[in-house]
Amino acid sequence: MSATGGAKSFTPPDIAKAKGKAPIVCLTAYTTPIARLLDPHCDVVLVGDSVGMVMHGLPSTLGVTLDMMIMHGKAVRRGLERALMVVDMPFGSYEEGPEQAFRNAARVMAETGCAAVKLEGGESMAETIRFLTGRGIPVMAHVGLTPQAVNAFGGYQVQGRGEDGDRVMRDAQAVAKAGAFSVVLEKVPEPLARRITKEIPIPTIGIGASPACDGQVLVVDDMLGMFTDFRPKFVKRYAELAEAAEAGIAAYAKDVRQRRFPAPEHVFSDMPKPVKGGEAA
């Protein structure tokens, strides 16, 4: 897919129709400036609950609240024109049952202006996905490693190795049958991701999965080198912005301490500035 050439925003049906075609480009965003940078290049922009770790300093995504997601969703919405905006449903906002999920997802959509929500889980979430999609809320699913279940998994291990691959396959099939328009496959063996992509009718979006997936997603702070606490194996760094920022900050601090900033060109005189017509500014 391509988010260039035309002003029309992508919709969930557009993404669903991309199955088997040009790869879907997806990145996360949490702020208006980053959303503006992503919009010309991305088909999908995900307001991920990873915001809790990369922007709020939380140790996991479990402490992210619905209000946090809505706040960041509003900011991202202001920066998008073309890309489809999807907002993560945070831990505790949908697991209780379909009614709770609908109530909170409807609030997220109404207050952020997003076009879809994403929730984690496979067979266990099929009923909820069916309930939401049947009431006008498009759902992007998420199977494999689901970070909100990190305590149940005992860590961030690869999911679906050996016989466990059948479980991940069933999860992917279940969310597709329930009506999800796409599914994120996170941290699963490459052959399994390839097989799931071939066998289910909805687009797969990989993160630590396979180049054969119908699309790819990364956390923008990871791929731009802004989040440096740790670096997952599946992340490719396309820039090193933290290093550049640190160098700029150090240069600024040095100039201030040596009274080289502000320089004459950065300050104002007490004389009126001439303008056209001889009038003073």
Curated annotation (Swiss-Prot):
Binds 1 Mg(2+) ion per subunit. Pathway: Cofactor biosynthesis; (R)-pantothenate biosynthesis; (R)-pantoate from 3-methyl-2-oxobutanoate: step 1/2. Mg(2+) binds at D49, D88, E120. Pfam families: Pantoate_transf (PF02548). Its main location: cytoplasm. Signal peptide: none annotated. SUPFAM superfamilies: Phosphoenolpyruvate/pyruvate domain. Keywords: Cytoplasm, Magnesium, Metal-binding, Pantothenate biosynthesis, Transferase. GO terms for biological process: pantothenate biosynthetic process. It is found in: Cytoplasm. Its EC number is 2.1.2.11. GO terms for molecular function: 3-methyl-2-oxobutanoate hydroxymethyltransferase activity; magnesium ion binding. It catalyses: 3-methyl-2-oxobutanoate + (6R)-5,10-methylene-5,6,7,8-tetrahydrofolate + H2O = 2-dehydropantoate + (6S)-5,6,7,8-tetrahydrofolate. GO terms for cellular component: cytoplasm. Homodecamer; pentamer of dimers. Belongs to the PanB family. Catalyzes the reversible reaction in which hydroxymethyl group from 5,10-methylenetetrahydrofolate is transferred onto alpha-ketoisovalerate to form ketopantoate. This is 3-methyl-2-oxobutanoate hydroxymethyltransferase. It comes from Chelativorans sp. (strain BNC1). The gene is panB.
